[in-house]
């Protein structure tokens, strides 16, 4: 085929620097729209790879952790990049979550720089175990196992300081029935996991009240 020049205008309603994939939403929307315009010549996996290039332009690194689920839907596992391998995981019917934004901005670069260059072997082992548990939880559709496995020892301890009252909020929502709480992306948004809709709504209210003071 021949090169085609296309201009895309995107109405972005996800705040940049929120930790919930604003750049990925733009990249995914652009490649999805162009694919539709051209008659859908590309597969979902190919669209993810194209959208990764948009992420690289905006963030410096081509990665699929946000554009993957944005284009394929649900929960995905990025097994590797060379070669690129992405796998959709089944999602339990009783998988609900609440997301809250504290109304502050944390740059992705700042959040990345907060991470240590090296971690203890014990932390690496714990993280690998939780990653395995998380994947197994989705494969088994076991929301309780998913919740137990959402324990991050690599990023959360170093990024939670950017989020006002993070530890107190986490203690509160876990006591209130959440199965887990963690930082969305690089922050400052946070999310909590629940096993039913009513609990997710209640937890959402708790997080909203916390950040509104």
Q: How does the language model describe each region?
A:
Residues 43-179, 193-212:
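ATP-dependent small-molecule kinase catalytic core of the GHMP/sugar-kinase superfamily
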Residues 23, 66, 185:
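Conserved acidic catalytic centers in enzymes
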Residues 180-184:
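Short beta-strand
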Residues 188:
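Conserved glycine-rich beta-strand-loop-beta hairpin in the small C-terminal domain of fold type I
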Residues 25-27, 39, 79-80, 191-193:
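Residues at secondary-structure transition points
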Residues 1-58, 174-175:
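Anion-binding (especially nucleotide phosphate/pyrophosphate-binding) glycine-rich loop
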């Amino acid at each position: 085929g021949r090169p085609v020049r296309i201009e895309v205008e995107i109405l972005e309603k996800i705040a940049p620097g929120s930790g919930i994939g604003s750049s990925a939403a733009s990249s995914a929307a652009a490649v999805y729209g162009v694919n539709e315009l051209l008659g859908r010549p590309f597969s979902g996996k190919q669209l993810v790879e194209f959208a990764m290039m948009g992420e690289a332009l905006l963030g410096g690194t081509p990665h699929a952790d946000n554009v993957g689920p944005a284009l394929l839907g649900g929960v995905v596992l990025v097994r590797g990049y060379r070669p690129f391998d992405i796998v959709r995981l089944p999602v339990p019917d009783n998988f609900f979550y609440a997301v809250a934004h504290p109304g502050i901005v944390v740059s992705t670069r700042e959040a990345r720089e907060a991470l240590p260059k090296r971690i203890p072997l014990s932390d690496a082992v714990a993280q690998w175990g939780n990653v395995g548990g998380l994947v197994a939880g989705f494969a088994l559709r076991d929301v309780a196992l998913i919740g137990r496995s959402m324990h991050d020892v690599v990023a959360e301890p170093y990024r939670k300081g950017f989020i006002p009252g993070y530890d107190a909020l986490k203690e509160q929502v876990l006591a209130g029935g959440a199965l887990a709480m963690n930082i969305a992306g690089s922050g400052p948004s946070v999310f909590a996991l629940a096993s039913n809709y009513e609990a997710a709504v209640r937890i959402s209210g708790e997080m909203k009240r916390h950040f509104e003071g």
